[in-house]
Amino acid sequence: MNQGEIVYQDDDDYYDESEIYDNYEEGAEFIEVNGQLVPHNPNLQAQQNRPGTSSMIQQHNRSMEVNQGLVKDEPIDTSSHRVYVPPPRPVQRKLFQPGPSTPGSSQYTVRNLSNLSGSPSMYDRQPASLPRTVQPMGLEMGNSEQRKVYIDMKDHVSHIRLKTKKKVFAPGQRKPCNCTKSQCLKLYCDCFANGEFCRDCNCKDCHNNIEYDSQRSKAIRQSLERNPNAFKPKIGIARGGITDIERLHQKGCHCKKSGCLKNYCECYEAKVPCTDRCKCKGCQNTETYRMTRYKNSGGAVSNTNALMSLTNASSTATPDSGPGSVVTDEHGDDYEDMLLSHKPKVEMDPRRFPWYYMTDEVVEAATMCMVAQAEEALNYEKVQTEDEKLINMEKLVLREFGRCLEQMITNTTELTQDLDAAPTDDIPGPSTSTS
């Protein structure tokens, strides 16, 4: 029998060999099937119509002949055989595609992938469109027009951010104005109120420049007619005596909720205390409040030690040393975080404050001493080069500054101790001068 004609039976086909042997042993009648004698079995005749049954019978008869020695057994050929494969089943594959309406919505499309046996890759895959990239601001980069709109909008947003970005100004640098309707000819324009021309400002339709000199002069005359002190500085200097010099606000502030501890309070920004001219509410920008808070924080105990440390540092400083320390109120920036309850103002002797002794005469005398040391260093004959003269001059000036500061601290401490020991019946009113 040709091995190439062997057909494997399906899973549902079966062949019961026990019935054949039982009939053969009992001497049942044989019938001729395809030129061969096989036991007669009605059940086997019903199975002959099924695919693969006749081949199975032929194979069984051949095995019987081999056992009886009628047919010689030959080696099995290892050539290929025909195999019945079950028909391919349709495979469903889910592909994700974004919805056309909203960028965040999604749809699922089911595609039947058939004809698996004919495709080399076993799958008839249709080209699926990739999800489109969703651009910011809801713009899709589908074509050139949308890309152009997106670029224009991005540039516009960048320009707005750059324009509204907070700028940092150097100390002493004037802030630009932002006038839009006053033409910078009103007193609420900082440039016009300070008697300066607008420069590098953000104002619109500006007339505060040399091109509109006639209109600017007319606006100045009108302002002076209404208020002769219109262009005077807001922070003025009043002299009540020979040594009583105070800096105060000309009109006073009108703060209500900040406690006069914010930079939009003109008194606080100018480093001057509020006075009776101010109409503020809940004011805490006073010397009494400053000293009370400083004592509660424990700074009054180490006040003298800190000043003496500054004196020693300035006396031993050299040009190679870094920038020296500056004595400041370490808790000055924490006023906003450590607000005390509002208390009635208590009158104190101004002679207890350190700024009381920093008069113009003391500053002038200390300056003259340092200038004399500088001249002496420049006229020093042993020093040959200019660099050595400058280095020596800096050393002598710093040493003289430390000596003057130490002398002022010593005298101030002695006078303060005398005030604590001696009772004072007449205490002058609180002074508003600062250093």
UniProtKB/Swiss-Prot annotation:
Ranges of Polar residues composition bias in the record: 102-120
Domain of life: Eukaryota
Gene ablation phenotype (knockout): Decreased protein levels of DRM complex components including lin-9 and lin-52. Double knockout with the programmed cell death regulator mcd-1 results in 100% lethality during the L1 stage of larval development. RNAi-mediated knockdown in a ced-1 mutant background results in reduced somatic cell apoptosis.
Subcellular location: Nucleus; Chromosome
Domain notes: The CRC domain mediates DNA-binding. It contains two CXC subdomains (joined by a flexible linker) which are both required for efficient association with target DNA. Each CXC subdomain coordinates three Zn(2+) ions.
Quaternary structure and interacting proteins, as annotated: Component of the DRM complex, at least composed of lin-9, lin-35, lin-37, lin-52, lin-53, lin-54- dpl-1 and efl-1.
Protein name as catalogued: Protein lin-54
Organism whose genome encodes this protein: Caenorhabditis elegans
